[in-house]
Regions:
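Non-catalytic, charged low-complexity extensions flanking SF2 helicase motor domains
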Residues: 262-266
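Ribosome large-subunit tunnel/peptidyl-transferase-proximal elements
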Residues: 2-260
């Protein structure tokens, strides 16, 4: 890393830390904010790329780079946590989308860990707005996999089986994360709006609420709740994913209690 780049980074960190020190926070809140700093959540993009609608989320600029106001980030991520928890507790499904190089491995790991639908490869147009067609493709994918595992495809020629295997591999790439999504989601969570605008547009068109991690170059009005963060850095997204994970698990726990209570009443 160049000396100039180091100086910019040092200045950015100093600006973020100074803001924390000057803000009336409890020791616990300051400690939590420091975790956001350590995870590089506060880095925006260059000032020249800033979307004017993001100005309210920007603390200052250092070396031509925007520094995100972490107070805004933490407020938004807490609000997001409540929305996610309440949506799942009420029986709604969520889908997580993140197809950028920084986001896809984190989205895949999170979805598998907490058992929610996710898209970590290309978001297929119509995943929400043409859900019936997508559902038909998912059913076909699941049947093809089942037939392959049961040996039902053994009756075909070697060439035909090779083609089936290629098709299974292709469909796995696009549908493995959403094969259990049997109804429209009640909430869309986007890891990096800049690289995932299609799910935001489809959610808006279908009147489905959306939450997104948004950098300073994106349009926060494209989603219902924008969380200003550094969405191009895997360390930042991995840290932020822990908040989403906690909210999902809390919602699932509340939902389980409701289901049990309902059965007892019957």
């Amino acid at each position: 890393m160049s000396k100039e780049k180091n100086n910019i980074n040092d200045a950015a960190i100093e600006a973020a830390e100074t803001a924390v020190l000057e803000t009336p926070l409890t020791p616990e809140e300051k400690a939590e904010t420091q975790l956001f700093i350590d995870a590089n959540v506060f880095y925006g993009q260059s000032h020249s790329r800033t979307n004017p609608k993001m100005n309210k989320y920007i603390l200052t600029s250092k070396g031509g780079m925007e520094i995100i106001d972490l107070a805004e980030t933490m407020r938004a991520i807490r609000e997001a946590g409540e929305i996610i928890k309440n949506t799942i507790a009420a029986g709604g499904e969520v889908v997580i989308a993140g197809t950028t190089p920084a986001g896809k491995p984190i989205v895949r790991a999170l979805g598998d860990k907490v058992g929610v639908s996710y898209v970590s490869e290309r978001w297929l147009g119509g995943t929400i707005t043409n859900f019936k067609t997508i559902s038909d493709r998912i059913r076909y994918f699941k049947k093809l996999k089942a037939d392959n595992e049961s040996g039902a495809l053994d009756k075909y020629t070697k060439k035909e089986r090779v083609n089936f295997n290629r098709e299974i591999a292709k469909l796995t790439r696009f549908f493995s994360g959403i094969e259990s999504m049997d109804r429209l989601p009640a909430l869309v969570i986007i890891f990096g709006l800049g690289g995932n605008i299609t799910p935001a547009l489809e959610a808006r068109k279908s009147k489905i609420p959306s939450i997104a991690f948004v950098n300073t170059a994106a349009d926060p009005d494209s989603v219902d709740l924008a969380i200003p963060v550094n969405d191009r850095n895997s360390e930042s997204l991995k840290f932020l994913a822990t908040y989403i994970e906690k909210a999902i698990l809390a919602g699932k726990a509340e939902r389980a209690k409701t289901v049990v209570a309902s059965k007892i009443e019957k």
